[in-house]
Amino acid sequence: MNNTISELAASIRSIPDYPKPGIIFRDITTLLGNPRAFRRAVDELVQPYAGTKIDKIAGMEARGFILGGAVAHQLSSGFVPIRKKGKLPHETVRIAYSLEYGVDEMEMHRDAVQPGEKVILVDDLIATGGTAVGATRLLRQIGAEVVGACFVIDLPDLGGRRKLEELGVVVHTLVEFSGH
């Protein structure tokens, strides 16, 4: 692990038994509160796409908004929020997606992305991949080209990265933590 990645990993707080026993919650608010770590994380998320024309960054609610906005700014791209059902005021497109314990829905404004636009998904963490797979399908449903997905944290034991890659999405992550 290089120094930057080690620093990023050290800036993420681990909270055992949250939100339930046996889960270790990876809290990036400590990374976001550290100006140096936040800057480095955004720089590392942007790096694979430097020099590439990316039309939009799609951030998933809620921490994906923070990171996605910063990535969009650095890449001079537009930003698109992907939200939980019922949170957007204009005409939307919606998709149901699977979670570890059920089904949920997400949506985005119908006119936020045009067919053929190149989009990168951004979120803080990929675990089972349900949200990221749902967002990929939602974007493709309106004709976007999902050219990549980037996350600060990967929990590889839960298989989310593999699910996205099976959909042909190139995945870029910064820090891996084992377990749940």
UniProtKB/Swiss-Prot annotation:
It holds the Pfam family Pribosyltran. PROSITE patterns: PUR_PYR_PR_TRANSFER (PS00103). Homodimer. Belongs to the purine/pyrimidine phosphoribosyltransferase family. Keywords: Cytoplasm, Glycosyltransferase, Purine salvage, Transferase. It catalyses: AMP + diphosphate = 5-phospho-alpha-D-ribose 1-diphosphate + adenine. This is Adenine phosphoribosyltransferase. One of its GO terms (biological process) is AMP salvage. Pathway: Purine metabolism; AMP biosynthesis via salvage pathway; AMP from adenine: step 1/1. One of its GO terms (molecular function) is AMP binding. SUPFAM superfamilies: PRTase-like. The gene is apt. Its EC number is 2.4.2.7. InterPro entries: Ade_phspho_trans, PRibTrfase_dom, PRTase-like, UPRTase/APRTase. GO terms for cellular component: cytoplasm. Catalyzes a salvage reaction resulting in the formation of AMP, that is energically less costly than de novo synthesis. It is an enzyme of class 2 (transferase). It is found in: Cytoplasm.
